Amino acid sequence: LLGMIPVAITAISALSKL
């Protein structure tokens, strides 16, 4: 699950830029 955390952060950051 810890490996999914950075992925989630990256996805949220990408959505924030839209």
Swiss-Prot record:
Q: Highest taxon of the source?
A: Eukaryota
The alphabetized UniProt keywords are: Amidation, Amphibian defense peptide, Antibiotic, Antimicrobial, Cytolysis, Hemolysis, Immunity, Innate immunity, Secreted
List locations, semicolon-separated.
Secreted
Disulphide bridges, residue numbers: none
- Respond yes or no to whether keyword ATP-binding is given for this record: no
Q: Which residues are reported to carry the modification Leucine amide?
A: 18
Q: In which tissues is it expressed?
A: Expressed by the skin glands.
Give the UniProt entry's GO cellular component terms. extracellular region
The Gene Ontology biological process annotation of the record reads: defense response to bacterium; innate immune response; killing of cells of another organism
Which family does the entry's similarity section mention?
Belongs to the frog skin active peptide (FSAP) family. Medusin subfamily.
Further notes on this entry?
The primary structure of this peptide is identical to that of Medusin-PT (AC A0A1M4BLT1).
Q: What job does the chain carry out?
A: Antimicrobial peptide with activity against Gram-positive bacteria S.epidermidis ATCC 12228 (MIC=50 uM) and S.aureus (MIC=64 ug/ml and MBC=128 ug/ml). Not active against some Gram-positive bacteria (methicillin-resistant S.aureus (MRSA), E.faecalis), Gram-negative bacterium E.coli ATCC 25922 and fungus C.albicans at concentrations up to 100 uM. Can only slightly inhibit the formation of biofilm by S.aureus (minimal biofilm inhibitionconcentration MBIC=512 ug/ml, minimal biofilm eradication concentration MBEC>512 ug/ml).
Protein name listed in UniProt: Medusin-TR1
Which taxonomic lineage is given here? Eukaryota, Metazoa, Chordata, Craniata, Vertebrata
